[in-house]
Amino acid sequence: MREQQGFLLITTADEKLRWADLVVRRMVKLSCGGSASFWALPATIRPLVRSSTWTLTCRRYASKEASPSALAIDGKSYPTDSWTNVPQNILSQYGRKLHVQPNHPLSITRQLIASRFPHFKNYDALPGVVTVEQNFDSLGFTPDHPGRNRTDTYYINQSTLLRTHTSAHEVDVFRANESPGYTISADVYRRGAVDKSHYPIFHQMEGALTWDHNAFSSKEACIEQITRDFEALPKHPLVVEDPNPTYQPSNPLQTLYHSPEEAEIVAKHLKRSLEDMVVTIFTEADKALAAAGHTTQGQDEPLKVRWVEAFFPHTSPSWELEVWWQGDWLEVLGCGVIDQPLLLRADQPQRIGWAFGLGLERLAMLLFGIPDIRLFWSTDPRFLSQFDESKPIRRFQPFSKHPAAPRDVSFWLPASTAGKPIITNTPATASTAPSPAGGQPTEPSTTTTPTTSDQQTPESPASAFHENDLMEIARNIAGDSVEDVKLIDDFTHPKKQRRSLCYRLTYRSLERTMTTEEANSLHDRITAELVERFGVEIR
């Protein structure tokens, strides 16, 4: 480096690196404090900044909170351990109970569904903290099921977690046997994607109806009663596509427990009941469209549904119900004949019945025309004032659209994980749609023996990058200001075999225009945390 006419001339590569190191350390020190940004560096300097400099600096200035020895949730204290991964932003939302909040769109949707099952007992206030045994073991989830992973589930400690589905209460409710029919609606928690359709806390509703063989003189008498109950159900004008037989090898009858006649009549009762519910929901959606001056479904063609064979861990045979809506088939729910071993675990071997599960957000977004799942958590009066459970359903009127602020982050994965596949989608994160009774869909297992409560959750995995971790970091730092996180490039260097990923993070406030400085500050903090936790090298 030499001086010429009062200016310092950088003449060698080493000097360039030292100069860039000095500048970026100053800038990033301020950036990590929230008052300046790496992106404010001169364009001529930014290319000189090496990922190693960014890594060292961010590691130095990224804040790292000490893990508490216990978590206080809903007035109770839970010890933490190496499995604990529940962030404060999730705990701060625990107990909001949007599904029972008066005049909230989720509550209105829940009530509309429950109205079609007037004799069912409704469980709407079950606690969200459950045991591993309740959430997984009691339902027959195998020890290596991906839903058990810390990358997918919020653990309070190794034996306790935030429920991932309403089915965590299923065995307990069946065992209590307070009513032949019930619904459960609740908030559920899963680590997963960041976009307009996914949120780490969402709401499920499940229902089930059973008949007690002990109340009848024979199986035939029970079948006759179910037939009478079926004939008493409301008839509807739906066009129904149901081309498959009730059971077949790909969708099997539970031959150890059910006769063909029992499965047939239970399936008929199930399908008619859920078709009636769908008519109610989509009729209201059609009315709301008409009131808003939009083209309604009924103007083009009658409402039609179709039954599609499916596989779920708690039912067999099983189906998904799809509705033809605005030019496309929309999956609404999963359902089936209850898996008899589940009833055995609930000490109800004499009962037979059906169950269904659905996502409340999915139906509420359709019913009210709500475009972004984050809105359900808004306390903005401009949102909440649009809904009134005492009045007909009306379409949501959006606020003025605030501009998006996209930012990209590109990084090399550490050498220890390069070449290994990135996990972008597992059964627990692929969708918020539940299987029957709210459970997580999975593939059939080659093992038919259910797991028992003494089977342990797999060992805590070593720290390695998982896409859900980036989603979690983004939500922890940016909260609801991050609208979308998407992988846009996955590159492996042909010679060095190092793997690079590039993600686009879109920032957008629902309530006001976000400044460039605010977006840059959030992005810098997310980048610093990514480097701190996983040792990635920013490109």
Protein language model annotation of sequence segments:
Residues M1-A66:
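N-terminal mitochondrial targeting presequence
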Residues R2, R26-K29, L41-T44, S63-Q204, ...:
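Class II aminoacyl-tRNA synthetase-like tRNA-binding/catalytic domains
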Residues S69-I90, E231-S250, F396-Q397:
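N-terminal, Lys/Arg- and Ser/Thr-rich interaction peptides
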Residues Q101-T109, E262-S273, A462-L470, E518-L522:
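Short amphipathic alpha-helical segments
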Residues D124-R150, E284-W325, D489-K496:
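Beta-rich nucleic-acid/ligand-interaction surfaces
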Residues Y199-H213, S217-K268, I352-L358, R362-F368:
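A conserved active-site cap/scaffold subdomain adjacent to cofactor or substrate pockets
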Residues S217-Y257, E284-D300, T417-A464:
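Intrinsically disordered, low-complexity domain-flanking/linker segments in eukaryotic proteins
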Residues D300, V308-P444, T449-R539:
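A carboxyl-terminal module marker
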